[in-house]
Amino acid sequence: MSDVFAPECEAPHEDFAVDGTVGNGSPGSTRADDGGAFGLGDSIVLGLLYFWLTSSIVAMGVALGVGYLPEVPTGAHKFDYDGDFYANWDGQWYKDIARHGYFYKEHDYSSVAFFPAFPLAGRLVARVTGLREEAALLVVANVFLAAAFALFSVYLRERFPDAPKDFRGYALLAMGILPTTFFFRMAYSESTFLICQILALLGIARRWPLAVVALVIGLGTATRPVGVALIPALLLYTKDQSATRGGYVLKSAMLVPLACWGVAAYMIYQAVAFGDPIAFARTQANWAARTAPSLGAKVVALATLEPFWTLYTPSAPGYWGKHTGPLDFPFSLRAADPFFFLGALGLIFLGFVKKWLSKYEAVSGACLLLIPYWTHGYEQHLTSMGRFAAAVVPVYPVLGRIAAAIPAPLVAALAAMSGFLLGAEAAFFVRWHTII
């Protein structure tokens, strides 16, 4: 069995050299962005520094929001709410799962829509430390985010040894300062999924055994349903590590189920607990703002970008302004969601065309965007697409490349603007303003 998962060929291919570097880099080469001075420990420290600096902006935004913004009455679900402002909206569902477990109602909102890895980690931390579940979830989210920054810094160092000066710092800054990344610091699952994604890409870059990469991706599928978007990259990696077509087919047949262990375990749980292994998928209909009259109509609508232009049509049911208060108007993520989504998709395309991204990074990035567009872009009027785009790791090396190529004063101005919006979005979020 172990031979099935072992590489059949050791020759490098077009995306990575055998040592995991790209271009003409080598383990002992001098890197353009750090002059060869940064080792593993320094890379980790650099990542943690950017985590602390950018998270400080979110913390200030939260403090200003709690201190000066009025709390908005909302019909959103509040489970045993006790002022846990960092666990608003989806965070309330995660808190309830961590505290009471899952429930499923066929024709009503149900907690099975939220995948288990993050709330179960929160429950474990709560049991061990005695913290309330919402506080434990906040700890989990930020510990995983700090780890993600450290790991991403290591990944950037190894994957892009010949990148321009300051590239790595700009890429780390982008991952911390884009406005929708404030969700990474709240009681949301984004940071948990982020680290799964970085681990999978790092594993491919370092030529980890196929089964290990598949297991990491499986954890991603236990965190978010879109974790399956990493499987195409695994299949490409498997192909590159297979000497024959037969070997590739055999390995793929064994690895794909392994890469789905998280969602498979969740489906088994739902089958036992609720008699329906796909309850998590069925309950999505209860969140839908509208339903497509047919599959064909949905395909046409998505292909013609109908969800985009109806979002800005005042007479359309999904018009963003109908759900936004006067104070929230300039900061509405509902209005900005299409721009984040299209921007991220454009960056993935640019990175692939310019050969800044490997095929693994490009295909995983594209799938991470297109799967949510297909599953609920129409039904939910593109809601949360900005949040989903923020959790697409391959976007950030491309932003780092662009930032390294433009004048530093312009980068500073853009960073200041983005940092302001980051803090503002956090401030509105903690007071239940309808910005999402």
Model-found features: residue ranges?
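Loop-to-helix entry region of an early transmembrane alpha helix in multi-pass inner-membrane enzymes
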Residues: 112-116, 120, 128-150, 330-339
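Transmembrane-helix motifs of polytopic, lipid-linked glycan transferases
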Residues: 124, 136-160, 343-350
